[in-house]
């Protein structure tokens, strides 16, 4: 491959990664719109039913099936990914603003790095600990927004969902060693959707179908765009560029989510929101460069 072809390949890979980051960022906006007419369990169920239906045929086409010995791990990771992460996250999103929810989710990389140092023995140097401290302070500033009350439960639920993120990120490393990324993701989301279905039906009953066009469009974008397409784009891009460069694009999620919350939804913000957001994104950026942490 000559230099020009290599540069073109890098450009396409980085475009894919940036697109995935943006799609994850817009999920907070479309999530808020969907939650205006549906409960969090139904939004999560429909989102990942669509995502599974879009990705699973690819896994089957590639002939990738879970080994029997890995079924319990797929089931556990699926549960941690869909009900434990996104059901709790959407529940929190229904009680708080998209801006702060997006910024809290931006703390994911430092939190994962912290638990990886505890359970996987991954090195976390001074810059890593500084990033964790900065992200913690950033969340404290971001949630203390002006003119908003009764948002603490929602903020706490979104933060709680990040503990589930830690679980499935660390456990999915085992699956990543034995399965291609996109087929593994397809099976994880499928198992996760199956574990969510009884919870959603018991909690909120049968999903309504008499929804507005905006709500249906939001659900479709959440399932096909923010889940299926985003995961496929991310896995394709991350296989073609160094991990330290790929991780930078994760910072688009909190940035895009927070900006849309302010500009489109008109959510309250202030200097503390900006400073808190900057600390969170900066901390995630530091952790993205794992070799220097």
Language model features by range: what are they?
Residues 29-37, 93-94, 140-153, 200-219, ...:
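Membrane-interface helix termini and inter-helical loops of multi-pass transporters
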Residues 1-45, 147-174, 195-196:
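Glycine-/small-residue-enriched transmembrane alpha-helix faces in small-molecule transporters
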Residues 29-30, 51-55, 112-114, 118, ...:
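Transmembrane alpha-helical segments that form core, pore/gating elements
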Residues 55, 75-77, 107, 115, ...:
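Hydrophobic transmembrane alpha-helices of multi-pass small-molecule transport proteins
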Residues 17, 69-78, 124-136, 154-155, ...:
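Cytoplasmic-side transmembrane-helix entry/capping segments in multi-pass membrane proteins
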Residues 34, 43, 47, 92, ...:
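Hydrophobic/aromatic residues within transmembrane alpha-helices
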Residues 23-28, 56-105, 113, 141, ...:
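Specific transmembrane alpha-helical segments of multi-pass solute transporters/efflux pumps
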Residues 44-46, 86, 100-107, 170-194, ...:
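Helix-helix packing/entry segments at the starts of transmembrane helices
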């Amino acid at each position: 491959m000559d230099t020009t072809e290599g540069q073109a390949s890098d450009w396409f890979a980085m475009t894919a990664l940036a697109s995935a980051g943006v799609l994850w960022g817009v999920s907070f906006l479309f999530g808020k719109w969907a939650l205006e007419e549906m409960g969090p369990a139904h939004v999560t169920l429909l989102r990942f039913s669509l995502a599974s239906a879009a990705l699973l045929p690819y896994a089957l086409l590639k002939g990738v099936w879970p080994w029997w010995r890995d079924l319990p791990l797929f089931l556990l990771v699926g549960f941690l990914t869909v009900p434990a992460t996104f059901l709790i996250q959407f529940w929190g999103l229904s009680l708080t603003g998209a801006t702060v929810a997006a910024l809290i989710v931006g703390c994911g990389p430092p939190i994962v790095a912290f638990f990886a140092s505890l359970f996987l023995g991954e090195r976390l140097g001074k810059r890593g600990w500084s990033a964790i401290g900065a992200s913690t302070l950033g969340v404290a500033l971001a949630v203390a927004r002006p003119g908003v009350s009764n948002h603490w439960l929602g903020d706490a639920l979104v933060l709680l969902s990040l503990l589930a993120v830690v679980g499935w990120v660390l456990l999915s490393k085992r699956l990543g060693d034995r399965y291609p990324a996109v087929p593994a993701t397809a099976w994880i989301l499928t198992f996760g959707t199956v574990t969510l279905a009884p919870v959603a039906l018991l909690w909120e009953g049968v999903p309504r179908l008499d929804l507005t066009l905006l709500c249906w469009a939001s659900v479709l974008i959440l399932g096909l765009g923010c889940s299926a397409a985003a995961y496929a784009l991310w896995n394709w891009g991350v296989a073609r560029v160094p991990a330290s460069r790929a991780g930078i694009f994760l910072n688009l999620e909190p940035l895009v989510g927070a900006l849309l919350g302010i500009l489109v939804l008109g959510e309250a913000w202030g200097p503390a929101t900006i400073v808190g957001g900057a600390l969170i994104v900066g901390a995630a950026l530091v952790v993205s460069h794992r070799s220097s942490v």
